[in-house]
Amino acid sequence: MEYFDLLKNEFEKAQAVAESARSKGFDSRAYVEIKPAPDLASRVEGIIGLPGLAEIIKANSAGKTREELAFEMVKQICTSDRFGTAEQKLLLAARVGLAVLTEGIVVAPTEGIQGVALHKNADGSDYVAILYAGPIRGAGGTSAALSVALVDYGRRLLNIGAYKPQQSEIERYVEEIQIYNTVAKLQYNPPEEDLRTILENCPVCVDGLPTEDAELGVHRNIKRLDANGKEEYISNRVRGGVALVICEGIAQKAKSVLKHTKNVGLDWSWLNSIIRIDKLKTSDAGASKDQHFLQELVAGRPILAYPNHSGSFRLRYGRSRYTGIAAKGFNPASMILLGEFIACGTQLKIDKPGKGCVAAPVDTIEGPFVKLESGEALRINTAEQAYAVKDKVRKIISVGDILVTYGDFKKSNTPLQPTSYVEEYWEAQAEKAGLKDAKAENFKEAYEISAKYNIPMHPQFIYEYSDITSQELAKLAEAVRKAKINSSAADLFSIDAIEVENTDGIAEILERLCVPHVEMSRSITISKDHAQALVAELGFSDSGALNMAKDLKIDLQKSALEIVNDNAPFKVMRRSTRIGARIGRPEKAKERLMRPAPNSLFPIGEYGGKERSLFKAYMYEKAKFNNRGIDIEMARYRCEKGKELVAGPYCRKHNSRARVERICVACGRVSESDVCPYCGSKTSSFETRHIDLMKLIDDAISNIKANSIPKNLKGVKGVINRDRIVEPIEKGVLRALHNVHTFKDGTSRFDATDMPITHFYPKEAGVSIEKLAELGYTEDYLHNKLESPDQLVELKHQDIIVNRKGAEFLLKVSQFVDSLLERFYGLKPFYNAKTIDDMIGHLVITLSPHTSAGILNRVIGFTDANVGFAHPYTVSARRRNCDGDEDTMMLLIDALINFSRDYLPTTIGGTMDAPLILTLNVNPS
């Protein structure tokens, strides 16, 4: 069976169980609310919530890029009679277009775009304003900027005029953006002249809701005209969405925006002036980048290496199975000797490329160069060596390699840096010169290859000449000229060691060069290959013969590396390009807990104390006995059969569903509308109700056949969803019995730092060959039959390797779910898991906090690292990279049964971090 079919079959089994449970009617809705979305069109429809939208998208998507499809959807909506007024069409068009651009994953289309309004310019012409809020950040800069272009495209189709701002409005924007940058920090803060260019030329008004407490100080009480020509005031509070769209969108992504607007015939050529200005400023980017690197330092999180500094991390291009999409590789010896501040998954802030990364161990790159207390200076390349010398290190001279992919430079729009001279570069040069599979076991072999094939010296035998001055090189050359040479013959390759007098800073020069040596009180000894290499590179050799009296070509106006190349019998490359790094956040793998952590979304106000303890509230009620009951704000559920008010969506007295009814806040009459038809006042679906808590809990315990109320049972102070819907207490009791906690949407979650992986060893993942075969793994990465736990296997891209604490979390949640199915819903248990090994092969949902589309994943192994390993395709499908952020994991059936939109708050951003839809198949195309 194909991989996707396996996932689909397992999902359908879980979904059938969840639908059976929900059909009992015990939950606020009698159906599973997480909608599976097999493709982009389905995801967009799920996010927007408009039935039939997917079919329109599919009908217009053939042969189009995402950007072209987004503009086409604007055209389809704005030229149709089906979608209401001009304002309604433009709002829907903006949201649908942005949802297409963001692949139907993030909530920015619905939460970040709060509305579209028509206004009048001073000359009486109409214009369009689009209202943004903070969640627009989740769309990314280019998509956020293109949402403005989408509205521009739509307003032209609807023959609505362009925005013509007054000078007072422009100056208000400029002040507002500077204040926002002070209180919230923009990733990109454009010059004021760029802001004025945008504001004077953008044909759509970028408007927004107030998001910050800060207010404008100078340009206050600015007036504008509404759609009817009446004056209205613009809020004096700062609008975060406005700043994000203008600065991190239009200004920062001007080049991309211009390209896409050209493609659809929109004249946004005014962006050229901003792009030209940006190009003129790139020469200053390096200095500002270094300053930015040192901003926001946190006490206790050390700076490991400064940018472009001697001894900092050496840039090495490449990728390992743990790196890419912002994850960087470090030698395990570097991680150990740097005080073990760096672990697998630790976030580091780096000066380039991008801003952050997570650390991954890579044992095939160069480790740190250190000086021991004994005086020996040497390179440490393995974890075993590092642990052996850990307590003997006097100082770390060079911290080793950082492995970076080309894609990280491209994605972050960072100019490529010159590569360090590494073994794979030398091997490529040798192969180009005609020598395949070149190896140099010692300096003599490297010398001979260099001479024969006219290629530079092997990187193992060159040193950091770019880190010393020409004067220091001249001083070192004289010291080597006077050195005592231990040699069996008068040729270069017979040198066993050289002893240099330990005076005048020679030891420090050798350290910065990273030449292995042993420092004694009076002398410094350099042995064998490195002695031969240093003598040759300083110029004391003619065709392999020693000539210590040779006159060297030393021009102090040149760099040390240039002088070496003037004298050495072979070419010596610049060895290192340096990268700065400092510790960011530590790695994380931990159950997500609200504070205090509830087992149930049942409100008890102040009755349970600060811990919101339902047990304490119950015992308090029991002690009062004659005065039972608490007053809490909750929905007015009316039993459909018995017609009496009940505490939840199901009336067990009459075995009937209950529905939420609305009541007038003024006259108290029941109504189905938001406005009372009798007195015109607002109606409400909730009120402060007197609840017999003791009876409610006793009934819940009886319903699930529990012995008594768990002492650790906790609820919440209150619920803030629209109708004040509460969760059945039975679920909370069962969670408490299994020590499981709930999040605000009814799910139980485990958070872990994102970490990429493309290949794994079965022994690493703690999974047997037999179990892997059941999951579809029958070959290693070379297509050999999988027979040994030591074979390297390519990871299927929706499979994940979870932290062991996460596996234990899944185990207890599975046991809770089985109890829930059996004791609350009257169904058969599904998981029947006894150990964490039983969780292998089961499905989970992973989700990023700025999105509302979960990804279906399968557990295939465990790790002791405090991270969540996933294929780069899965991480990217969550609209993430691995720069130190964390995502969450939920057991599939727990989410399908217990998640409800009815629990979500109605505030802006309320649907973020909620699995409204589920991507079943991650299609990397």
Give names to the regions the model predicted.
Residues 1-837, 841-855, 859-863, 877, ...:
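Extended, Lys/Arg-rich, non-catalytic nucleic-acid recognition/anchoring regions
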Residues 885:
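Conserved structured catalytic cores and adjacent interaction surfaces
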Residues 869:
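Conserved phosphate-coordination/catalytic loops
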Residues 872-875:
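Short hydrophobic "helix-edge" motifs at membrane interfaces and signal-peptide entry regions
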